[in-house]
Amino acid sequence: MTSDLDTRLDLLRNITSKVGAFALARFGNLSHIVIETKGEADYVSAADRDAESLARRLIHAQFPADAIVGEEQLGDAEVDHWLIDPIDGTANFLSGIPLWAVSIAFVRNKEPVLGAVALPALDTLLWASVDGPLHGTGSVSPLVGAQPIAFGIGRNRTWPLAHRLEVEAAFEARGYHIVCLGSCAAALAMVAAGRLAGYVEHGTHLWDCAAGHVLCRAAGAPSSILFEADGKVAIIAAPQHLRVTAKADARSLSEKHIFDPGSDRISHRMESSAD
């Protein structure tokens, strides 16, 4: 990793931690937060905007010329840039559910190369460069040799229901328990930390998944981001014995694009590991 990326990774870790602490203070005082909507069942609050503004100020204090793209303020994504989701899992955050994340990545040559995800209500911070290693502190620090039986699905409204149900049924048929955490970044952090076997979501945004994608790659978990013409993406972080076929795309993502024809059921994999 180049020296400028080393510097940015240190900054990324510090900023994500600080923004997490900022958001956590507001999470403890939800009665004073005004909730707005950006679209159907798409919520935002002053906490989201203020957290993103803090991240922008902290980045520009050290790298004033760097471009920044955020969920709430957008920006120039055609050059190297920082990518911010100040509170991923806003519905959880506004409901007092502790499964939400601060997700910040750095993108070089249109590829996420650095990422950090804070789970402030779980006292957890994970960060990495895409080539590793994965670093972590707190209650969800990385596990080695884990064999999780839960698989995460992002139940995004733009993912065609028939395709999503097909994917869920396929994972269940292989012995996985399906969970939806309500935060793409939190779920990918759980994959990287060895708590979830994998994660799939269609119709999300790059700021939701870029940092988590980096964490998964750093942890050795295969992860792919598939782009659509409308700017949305699909994220697939799958176990080692699964893969994404070359014909997969975000719009038609379904079971046949994720599984090897001969991929083992989870029960077979776990039995083999116990031998």
Curated annotation (Swiss-Prot):
Any one GO cellular component localisation term in the record: plasma membrane
Alphabetized InterPro entries for the sequence: Inositol_monoP_metal-BS, Inositol_monophosphatase-like, Inositol_monophosphatase_CS
Membrane topology, as annotated: Multi-pass membrane protein
Any one GO BP annotation for this protein: phosphatidylinositol phosphate biosynthetic process
Main location, first listed in the record: membrane
Record-listed substrate binding positions: E71, I87, D88, G89, T90, D208
Chain positions recorded as Mg(2+) 1 binding sites: E71, D85, I87
Subcellular location(s) per record: Cell membrane
Regions that span the bilayer: 87-107, 112-132, 178-198
Binding site for Mg(2+) 2: D85, D88, D208
Pfam families per record: Inositol_P (PF00459)
Ranges in coiled-coil conformation: none
One MF annotation (Gene Ontology) recorded for this entry: metal ion binding
Keyword entries, A-Z: Cell membrane, Hydrolase, Magnesium, Membrane, Metal-binding, Plasmid, Transmembrane, Transmembrane helix
Family note: Belongs to the inositol monophosphatase superfamily.
Name of the protein in its database record: Uncharacterized protein y4fL
Native organism: Sinorhizobium fredii (strain NBRC 101917 / NGR234)
